[in-house]
Amino acid sequence: MQDILTVILAGGMGSRLSPLTDDRAKPAVPFGGKYRIIDFTLTNCLHSGLRKILVLTQYKSHSLQKHLRDGWSIFNPELGEYITSVPPQMRKGGKWYEGTADAIYHNLWLLERSEAKYVMVLSGDHIYRMDYAPMLEEHIANNAALTVACMDVNCKEAKAFGVMGIDEHHRVHSFVEKPQNPPHLPNDPERSLVSMGIYIFSMEVLQQALIEDADNDASSHDFGKDIIPKLIDTGSVFAYKFCGSKGRVDKDCYWRDVGTIDSFYQANMDLLEPIPPMNLYQKDWGIRTYEPQYPPARTVSSGSGNEGIFINSMISNGVINSGGSVQHSIVSSNVRINDSATIVDSIIFDDVEIGEGCQLVNCIIDKHVKVPPYTQIGLNRLEDAQRFKISENGIVVVPESYQF
């Protein structure tokens, strides 16, 4: 995989995920108790043999850059391997990135310097496991200008994605970004074929496409809206279907865009299913992250004699449960749960203390929050709405470092 450069787009604001993104980039949002969202894309790169990686950052990137430094400084520069965080360089003028394609256009000099033949473009804010090596093999075998990873979804969900039409040879003949009436599959009127935002370009094709797009004042400088539709006319754009038997990943067919509070919450809750739809336990595809060296989680009796209990939950290192009850929840590292506190259907980020007698239901508590004793969250929507953001599905979000 020496001939391919990987570019991860990690600079979006993620405003729909507010307040979790008020002080961090979306790819840096904690997920699954111990991970960050970007860890899943980076892990895919690691296990797929991709060793030249640029992470394009922009919006409130300090937390993301720190995570990359602490958890992902693992490649060997002497072998030409690297993961490099690239903030906006302003080499094309004093403007921020104006779209996904514009972000890479501003860094064309890095692509040229890499001497790679192919460029893989990935998003840093999706949750999935995928071996990219078979996709590159198909791209080369097809002599493709562009290969787009795709999957089929319900037509109602397809409105949020780029929808593709392909022939029997997987050649893409149509592409429309976020249509109100998505075209359905020929053999299934309820399903549409959508882009996953995973692309492999031949280097010269990408360079030329970005230069032409930058000169077009009418362009929104977006891959889905501008670059891909124009390349389809060349007849050299192919689809690669996700969720097959190719590659080393167990077939779990799980891919989620966690762009809203509700989708983020549900993706976390998916991990608590009796048989999770995404397998975190495949031994030869471990999800890498940075994790502080806390001692193992423990339960202990409280002064009143209550035993700390965990039921169908994911618990990270450093957690101490002193007589509280945690059910169907995800608890991140270094959390303290005090006597008679109950946590149900919730996500607790790092360094949180839950006071005695608290009742937390259907909520997300961001980092560095001390919840006072006997506080109730998720039980009274009117009271919660006066203090916190509540999602469409009723998930209450307590922001980072909130003071009660």
From Swiss-Prot:
GO terms for molecular function: ATP binding; glucose-1-phosphate adenylyltransferase activity. Its EC number is 2.7.7.27. The keyword Membrane does not apply. It holds the Pfam family Hexapep_GlmU. This is Glucose-1-phosphate adenylyltransferase 2. NCBIfam families: glgC, PRK00725.1, PRK00844.1. It catalyses: alpha-D-glucose 1-phosphate + ATP + H(+) = ADP-alpha-D-glucose + diphosphate.
